[in-house]
């Protein structure tokens, strides 16, 4: 097949599209001399983080025997001494070779200290030069080690740890390994570890990240004497520039996901799925703008502020940036309310920041049934009102199949979300229209008004999904 398009996006992970198109790419580690990265090696290498599969077990309520298949790889307690795989290892594992032993132990325990689901450290990197072509061979070895690990957990009686897995039956073993690292396509800028540790705010920022600089052992599980991950933690977040999302030498190629333009240490943070997701959203918006202006990705640079404002409009977040949309009438309105809590004054719905940051509310905090009033000196034909509600970004949501972790998650709609909203429009004191939002389950809610003339709107959050406070983080208003 031959596909023709003005712009392509390589979101393959392996940089497959870019590779076949002749895009410049990198693999392995850059030397410290190239970017001055704190944790870079003195010499370049072809190390890569490995592929992983997971396994899942179920408590049957009675003892269950396990006989390993013939291909299972035998593992000893000594070999797994650096791999947390049961609660008892909380007190015995030696993390002294971690840059931050206590933080490492805490974060590792979150996902590994159970026998019913794991393990992120079940990781292999292959034997050759190209982890991509070795994918199936690595998969076969991973499956063999997965059964070997389960055999160890079920049947090993020689170690110092009691695994307490007598009643557990192996329920599922993954068949498609997750990939952490392969090719990185080169753009006009390579994000480095230095940028991350310095929390750099780029003028052309279109995405942000906050995961630690998380490099795994060079040979994965087979580095038995090493901790599986070398996590370098830091406070705060960093931004990723637009220049890291398009190819340096293929003029109509974007990248999104883990194949964006970074050093290997940059990838150690940006590869996390949440960062990949919001970077993909930014690239999608950028591609639409390329269509609007009939230009290539690099040629879109003069319009990067428009791109940033569109990201914010869609409830994206860019540290160091705020809503400056000239079409947003809320930025020019007089705003008050029937009541509010200290720190959650009504005018903050138009301060340009749509989420709580530290102790700063950045929004109107009140009780259900109260009214926010927005006025203008002249009549507007209101077409759309965009409401951004509190959804509790501070609540940890873990994407996992672990029964223990799933039991800790709240089900359903966040209780903090406003559920029912009434919107009233007035012109010279007379009502000209109204709109309702019922059973809302979204953080960003767009309400089409239909070009109603008004010089005043009133927003009444009538109920929430359970919380006592009703919180409106942002309110945007657009006219005909």
Region annotations inferred by a language model:
Residues 431-450:
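Extracellular carbohydrate recognition and processing domains
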Residues 460-467:
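Short beta-strand-plus-loop segments that form exposed binding edges in beta-rich domains
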Residues 369, 377-386, 453-456:
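Extended extracellular/luminal ectodomain segments enriched in beta-structured repeat modules
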Residues 313, 317-379, 390-417, 439-441, ...:
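Disordered, acidic Ser/Thr/Pro-rich linker "stalks" and the adjacent N-terminal cap
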Residues 1-327:
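Flavin (FAD/FMN)-binding glycine-rich loop and adjacent Rossmann-like elements that form
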Residues 421-423:
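Short beta-strand elements bearing conserved aromatic residues within extracellular beta-rich modules
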């Amino acid at each position: 097949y031959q596909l023709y398009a003005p712009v392509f996006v390589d979101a393959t992970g392996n940089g497959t599209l870019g590779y076949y198109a002749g895009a410049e790419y990198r693999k392995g580690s850059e030397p410290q001399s190239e970017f001055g990265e704190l944790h870079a090696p003195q010499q370049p290498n072809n190390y890569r983080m490995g592929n992983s599969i997971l396994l899942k077990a179920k408590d049957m309520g009675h003892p269950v025997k396990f006989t390993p298949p013939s291909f299972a790889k035998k593992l000893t307690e000594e070999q797994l001494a650096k791999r947390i795989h049961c609660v008892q290892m909380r007190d015995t594992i030696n993390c002294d070779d971690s840059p931050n032993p206590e933080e490492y132990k805490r974060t590792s325990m979150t996902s590994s200290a159970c026998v019913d689901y794991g393990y992120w450290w079940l990781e292999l990197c292959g034997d050759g030069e190209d982890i991509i072509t070795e994918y199936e061979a690595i998969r076969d070895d991973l499956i063999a080690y997965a059964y070997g690990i389960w055999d160890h957990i079920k049947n090993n009686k020689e170690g110092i740890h009691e695994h307490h897995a007598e009643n557990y039956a192996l329920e599922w073993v993954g068949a498609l390994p997750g990939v952490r690292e392969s090719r990185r396509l080169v753009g006009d800028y390579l994000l480095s570890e230095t940028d991350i540790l310095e929390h750099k705010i780029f003028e052309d920022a279109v995405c942000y990240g906050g995961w630690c600089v998380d490099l795994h052992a060079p040979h994965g599980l087979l580095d038995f004497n090493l901790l599986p991950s070398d996590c370098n933690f830091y406070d705060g977040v960093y931004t990723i520039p637009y220049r890291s999302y398009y190819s340096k030498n293929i003029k109509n190629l974007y990248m999104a996901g883990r194949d964006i333009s970074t050093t290997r240490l940059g990838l150690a943070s940006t590869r996390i799925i949440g960062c990949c997701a919001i970077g993909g959203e930014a690239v999608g918006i950028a591609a639409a703008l390329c269509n609007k202006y009939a230009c290539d990705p690099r040629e879109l640079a003069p319009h990067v502020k428009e791109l940033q404002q569109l990201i914010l409009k869609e409830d994206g977040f860019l540290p160091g940036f705020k809503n400056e949309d000239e079409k947003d009438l809320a930025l020019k309105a007089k705003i008050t309310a029937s009541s509010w809590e200290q720190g959650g004054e009504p005018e903050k719905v138009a301060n340009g920041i749509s989420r709580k940051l530290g102790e700063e509310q950045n929004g109107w905090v009140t009780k259900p049934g109260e009214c926010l009033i927005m006025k203008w000196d002249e009549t507007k034909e209101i077409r759309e009102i965009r409401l951004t509600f509190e959804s509790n970004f501070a609540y940890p949501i873990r994407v996992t199949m672990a029964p223990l972790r799933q039991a800790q998650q709240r089900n359903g709609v966040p209780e903090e979300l406003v559920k029912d909203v009434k919107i009233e429009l007035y012109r010279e004191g007379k009502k000209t229209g109204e709109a309702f939002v019922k059973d809302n389950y979204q953080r960003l809610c767009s309400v089409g008004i239909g070009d109603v003339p008004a010089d005043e709107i009133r927003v009444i959050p009538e109920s929430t999904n359970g919380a006592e406070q009703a919180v409106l983080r942002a309110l945007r208003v657009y006219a005909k």
